[in-house]
């Protein structure tokens, strides 16, 4: 029996168009009361699908931001924010895996404090599922001591079968620790961090120094065997401007004391 051809209206495959509108509805960009089955490919809806193409096609996920006060902090961290109808949404960042493939979060949400929680589903070489949860903290760099205190207070409670490590990334180095206290103490041995706490860095340097900080946990029955050395928490990424500053310091005989 021959398959039915998809119904086309205004040059669009109608069913595919409805699916794209449905994705916008799930993301909160159009009213929840809308009956997608009755939507016609009008100029209005075609415009919305075109404007939010990556969301409509399922290539990007949105999360509602429940507290408008954290929008400025999220934008300063380089997050992509969509504002529509008096509401704000965070567009989830994509990851590139080792094969060069784009990986979208399994789920993404924003807490009232402004924490961004992303959950990814990956598999072991044997095909077993592993879940990776990333939680980025909305901590401004202006108060470094508070930043470090909140970072330490926001640690995860381990659940049965979970594996957790702490890694510091920055200044062209990466070190992984099994104890948060050990990682925290090593974190504080860097000259550039000590200068920040002591207020020796200029405001523009502070803004460039740290992009984000967060925790990452791996859970699932295969968590322990998944990858022992790639769980990173806290993760601190230095901007290009900060890296250049650090290189100049090294040439003058300064640098990090620890690593």
Curated annotation (Swiss-Prot):
GO molecular function, one term: DNA binding
Keywords associated with the record: Covalent protein-DNA linkage, DNA replication, DNA-binding, Early protein, Host nucleus, Nucleotide-binding, Phosphoprotein, Viral DNA replication, Virion
Residues modified to O-(5'-phospho-DNA)-tyrosine: 190
Motif (Nuclear localization signal): 243-259
UniProt subcellular location: Virion; Host nucleus
Domain of life assignment: Viruses
GO biological process: DNA replication; viral DNA genome packaging; viral DNA genome replication
Subunit record text: Heterodimer with viral polymerase. Binds to ssDNA.
Role description: Acts as a primer for viral genomic replication. DNA terminal protein is covalently linked to the 5'-ends of both strands of the genome through a phosphodiester bond between the beta-hydroxyl group of a tyrosine residue and the 5'-phosphate of the terminal deoxyadenylate. This protein is essential for DNA replication and is involved in the priming of DNA elongation.
Family: Belongs to the tectivirus DNA terminal protein family.
Name the UniProt record assigns to this protein: DNA terminal protein
Source species: Enterobacteria phage PRD1
Gene from which this protein is expressed: VIII
């Amino acid at each position: 029996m021959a398959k039915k051809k998809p119904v086309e209206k205004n040059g669009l495959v109608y069913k595919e168009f409805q699916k794209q509108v449905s994705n916008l509805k799930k993301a909160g960009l159009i009213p929840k009361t809308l009956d997608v089955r009755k939507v016609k490919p009008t100029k209005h809806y075609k415009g919305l699908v075109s404007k939010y193409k990556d969301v409509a096609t399922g290539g990007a996920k949105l999360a509602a931001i429940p507290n408008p006060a954290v929008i400025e902090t999220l934008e300063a961290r380089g997050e992509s924010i969509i504002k529509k109808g008096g509401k704000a949404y965070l567009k989830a960042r994509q990851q590139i895996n080792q094969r060069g493939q784009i990986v979208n979060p399994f789920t993404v949400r924003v807490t009232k404090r402004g924490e961004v929680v992303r959950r990814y589903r990956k598999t072991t070489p044997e095909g077993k599922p592993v879940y990776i949860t990333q939680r980025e903290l909305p901590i401004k760099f202006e108060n470094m001591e508070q930043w470090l205190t909140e970072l330490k207070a926001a640690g995860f409670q381990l659940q049965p079968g979970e594996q957790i490590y702490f890694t510091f990334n920055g200044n062209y180095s990466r070190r992984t620790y099994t104890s948060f206290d050990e990682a925290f103490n090593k974190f504080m041995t860097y000259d550039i961090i000590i200068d920040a706490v002591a207020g020796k860095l200029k405001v523009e340097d502070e803004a460039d120094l740290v992009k984000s900080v967060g925790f990452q946990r791996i859970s699932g029955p295969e968590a322990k065997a998944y990858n022992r050395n790639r769980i990173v928490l806290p993760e601190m990424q230095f901007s290009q401007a900060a890296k250049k500053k650090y290189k100049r310091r090294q040439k003058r005989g300064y640098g990090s004391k620890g690593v």
